[in-house]
UniProtKB/Swiss-Prot annotation:
Lineage: superkingdom: Bacteria
Gene3D superfamilies: Thymidylate synthase/dCMP hydroxymethylase domain (3.30.572.10)
Location(s) in or outside the cell: Cytoplasm
UniProt xrefs under InterPro entries: Thymidate_synth/dCMP_Mease, Thymidate_synth/dCMP_Mease_dom, Thymidate_synth/dCMP_Mease_sf, Thymidylate_synthase, Thymidylate_synthase_AS
PANTHER family found in the cross-reference section: THYMIDYLATE SYNTHASE, THYMIDYLATE SYNTHASE 1
Reactions listed under catalytic activity: dUMP + (6R)-5,10-methylene-5,6,7,8-tetrahydrofolate = 7,8-dihydrofolate + dTMP
The protein's name: Thymidylate synthase
Molecular functions per Gene Ontology: thymidylate synthase activity
Family of the protein in this entry: Belongs to the thymidylate synthase family. Bacterial-type ThyA subfamily.
Oligomer status and interactors: Homodimer.
Length: 264
């Protein structure tokens, strides 16, 4: 994951100080891209230990179309707690937009189901896109989508995915986002009968929070370790049938976890 450390180092050396919504302050650059060959290993950061359980359950929760944290709480995942209301609701966030985008005529569009159907019918389509950024509903969301839009691409029997992340919390958020969309790419590839290709991460406002600088500097002193591999249950043939038990991370070795505060 040298690409990730290179981004962190670039922001430390060239980032502009900016105020932000949380009042914490950030050091920021605009526009950055990282590419990960999924055949070379699963892109889970090794310079600090990452909590894969949270990554997997969050992705499954998105795919369910859920916007209440009850499922996450049931499985010991607390990453959305700070934004939920007293009933555990978050408003029309990722899962709702992915699975039930409201159309003007009253219909609800299942973008994920449409994507899977299009992949099988016309894998060369340039419309293999899912968007979570719905301007009409931004004000109703507890947190507007940071990872806003992703697109799939098929070539030579391989499936690649590119994510556009408008707001990228480099220390805490980005390692989760890379692993989450890499995992989604593996899942979609298996169901569609394709091999995994690349995951391409494109960031807009790429920032380190001012209270993450010491942690980032510590991480930059560490040497990346070999990437692990991710095994999926080959019996799963429908994207919505995946369960937590269908994933096995093999050979993950990482440096110790580095704690940092979440900016809410």
């Amino acid at each position: 994951m040298k690409q990730y450390l290179d981004l962190m180092r670039h922001v430390r050396e060239h980032g502009t100080f900016k105020s932000d919504r949380t009042g914490t302050g950030t050091y920021s650059v605009f526009g950055h891209q990282m590419r990960f060959d999924l055949a070379a290993g699963f892109p889970l950061v090794t310079t600090k230990k990452c909590h894969l359980k949270s990554i997997v359950h969050e992705l499954l929760w998105f795919l369910k179309g859920s916007t209440n944290i009850a499922y996450l709480k049931e499985h010991g995942v607390s990453i959305w707690d700070e934004w939920a209301d007293e009933n555990g609701d978050l408003g029309p966030v990722y899962g709702y937009q992915w699975r039930s985008w409201p159309a003007p005529d009253g219909r609800h569009i299942d973008q994920i189901a449409n994507l899977m159907a299009m992949l099988k019918k016309n894998p060369d389509s340039r419309r293999l896109i899912v968007s979570a950024w719905n301007p009409a509903l931004i004000d109703e969301m507890a947190l507007p989508p940071c990872h806003a839009l992703f697109q799939f691409y098929v070539a030579d029997g391989k499936l690649s995915c590119q994510l556009y992340q408008r707001s990228a919390d480099i220390f805490l958020g980005v390692p989760f986002n890379i692993a989450s969309y890499a995992l989604l790419t593996l899942m979609v590839a298996q169901v569609a009968g394709l091999q995994p290709g690349e995951f391409i991460w494109t960031g807009g406002d790429c920032h380190l929070y001012a209270n993450h600088l010491e942690q980032a500097d510590l991480q930059l002193t560490r040497e990346p370790l070999p990437l692990p591999s991710m095994k999926l249950n080959p019996e799963v043939k429908d994207l919505f049938d995946f369960r937590f038990e269908d994933f096995e991370l093999v050979g993950y070795e990482a440096h110790p976890h580095i704690k940092a505060p979440v900016a809410v």
